[in-house]
Amino acid sequence: MAKFEDKVDLYDDRGNLVEEQVPLEALSPLRNPAIKSIVQGIKRTVAVNLEGIENALKTAKVGGPACKIMGRELDLDIVGNAESIAAAAKEMIQVTEDDDTKVELLGGGKRALVQVPSARFDVAAEYSAAPLVTATAFVQAIINEFDVSMYDANMVKAAVLGRYPQSVEYMGANIATMLDIPQKLEGPGYALRNIMVNHVVAATLKNTLQAAALSTILEQTAMFEMGDAVGAFERMHLLGLAYQGMNADNLVFDLVKANGKEGTVGSVIADLVERALEDGVIKVEKELTDYKVYGTDDLAMWNAYAAAGLMAATMVNQGAARAAQGVSSTLLYYNDLIEFETGLPGVDFGKVEGTAVGFSFFSHSIYGGGGPGIFNGNHIVTRHSKGFAIPCVAAAMALDAGTQMFSPEATSGLIKEVFSQVDEFREPLKYVVEAAAEIKNEI
């Protein structure tokens, strides 16, 4: 039996209806098979840069910047022997021959997509098994393939896994995961939020609605892990996931379509308020001179509508600029305006607006330490909104036309080449909506 009475209509990224009257819980990370698969896949998947390993050994440049050990060069044809190396690595990574291990070569043997078997995570406290098991297997496979001596084996390890354990992170490694190392988490349950915006944008090949969907899945699934989406707050997070990230009832798409040509953040707000009135989410509570104060009997649904409006406003504003840099201002002033317009709380009850103040400072202003694309939901500046800010940043970076110094191409090239090959990472909206439609009658 369903916990909640809410039902939504689900659409694809072109605004076409896929399924009507889907129970809200069919989009829950606890119930939706595609979301479960995406989350498990992100934990299990590792990108291996075989060409990078070969070049690192050839030049003896290992362990990060300014590390060249002259006299320790190794000229190994790793790319040319990629098939043999990958087969040997897979044999070490797998638990049984018929498990869900995957080692797939890409780009003519220059890259490898590795998915560590689920069985390894059944006996793991967290997700470090993916990069560490993969790295160790490829190190041994390369050593065995080329009969590397015991005196040169450490160079192979350094070329694959970098400076670790002398460094906390895998500095200079030629492997990549979307999840960052556990030591960088701001607190318990933050792992799925600790994924750079640019990684999400790269994996979805800069498709705006898909990037927003993947970011929302990660952020809102983290809320279940953190204990935020429990009890009285579960419905609020599910509605946010549905409307802001999954384009429920085509709300985001409709707002962008209506405002895309000549609209502004303000016109999106006007349309959003009108839609909320039509749908009975809000009502006029008090009429003053030339001003209406609105009220609602369903704050969680109002928050979902406001969050969808915020996503649409981001797409309209950053899309018009073809630049992501202004996304912090959109996050801030959309909420400022909607609070004045309605008398109701902004998205996430003020937490997005508050996040945007610090985000503006740290991506612009006196400090200006990095562009929007290098932030994540675990970052000390942007962690405060519980799942409603970072998806808009992902949408903004997907719309950016190359204005950023820290672009997805610059920070996330290996992620793009490898992770985008996984259909569910590249088109999460499609697979989550289809899965929700399949299980709707089971809820």
From Swiss-Prot:
InterPro entries: Me_CoM_Rdtase_asu/bsu_C, Me_CoM_Rdtase_asu_N_sub2, Me_CoM_Rdtase_bsu, Me_CoM_Rdtase_bsu_C, Me_CoM_Rdtase_bsu_N, Me_CoM_Rdtase_Fd-like_fold. GO terms for biological process: methanogenesis. It is an enzyme of class 2 (transferase). Signal peptide: none annotated. Its EC number is 2.8.4.1. Keywords: Cytoplasm, Methanogenesis, Transferase. Binds 2 coenzyme F430 non-covalently per MCR complex. Coenzyme F430 is a yellow nickel porphinoid. Methyl-coenzyme-M reductase is activated when the enzyme-bound coenzyme F430 is reduced to the Ni(I) oxidation state. Component of the methyl-coenzyme M reductase (MCR) I that catalyzes the reductive cleavage of methyl-coenzyme M (CoM-S-CH3 or 2-(methylthio)ethanesulfonate) using coenzyme B (CoB or 7-mercaptoheptanoylthreonine phosphate) as reductant which results in the production of methane and the mixed heterodisulfide of CoB and CoM (CoM-S-S-CoB). This is the final step in methanogenesis. This is Methyl-coenzyme M reductase I subunit beta. It comes from Methanothermobacter thermautotrophicus (strain ATCC 29096 / DSM 1053 / JCM 10044 / NBRC 100330 / Delta H) (Methanobacterium thermoautotrophicum).
